[in-house]
Amino acid sequence: MKAKDIRKKSQEELQKELVELKAELFKLRFQHATNQLENPMKLRDVKKSIARIKTVLRERELKGIEV
């Protein structure tokens, strides 16, 4: 997910997306540990998406904006 798309979403949508991505990351880590993960790059992509969402949420917190 691109940062531009993330910035268009509301606070609640971002919180929901963050929870979903964290759950997906948990599943992927478990699959990776048991050697069932076909594409290890998926781990990196999910981690980066989580970081992007957290960054946007923090920016909004500092600005005091709730879009």
UniProtKB/Swiss-Prot annotation:
Annotated GO biological processes are:
translation
Report the SUPFAM superfamilies cross-referenced here.
Ribosomal protein L29 (L29p)
**Residues that span the membrane, as ranges:** none
Q: What is the lineage of its organism?
A: Bacteria, Bacillati, Bacillota, Clostridia, Eubacteriales
Question: A GO molecular function for this record?
Answer: structural constituent of ribosome
The UniProt keyword set, sorted, is:
Ribonucleoprotein, Ribosomal protein
Q: What is this protein called?
A: Large ribosomal subunit protein uL29
HAMAP family the record matches: Ribosomal_uL29
What family is this protein classified in? Belongs to the universal ribosomal protein uL29 family.
What organism does this protein naturally occur in? Acetivibrio thermocellus (strain ATCC 27405 / DSM 1237 / JCM 9322 / NBRC 103400 / NCIMB 10682 / NRRL B-4536 / VPI 7372) (Clostridium thermocellum)
A GO cellular component annotated for this chain's UniProt record is: cytosolic large ribosomal subunit
Output the Pfam families linked to this UniProt entry: Ribosomal_L29 (PF00831)
InterPro entries documented for this protein: Ribosomal_protein_uL29 (IPR050063), Ribosomal_uL29 (IPR001854), Ribosomal_uL29_CS (IPR018254), Ribosomal_uL29_sf (IPR036049)
Which N-terminal stretch is annotated as signal sequence? none
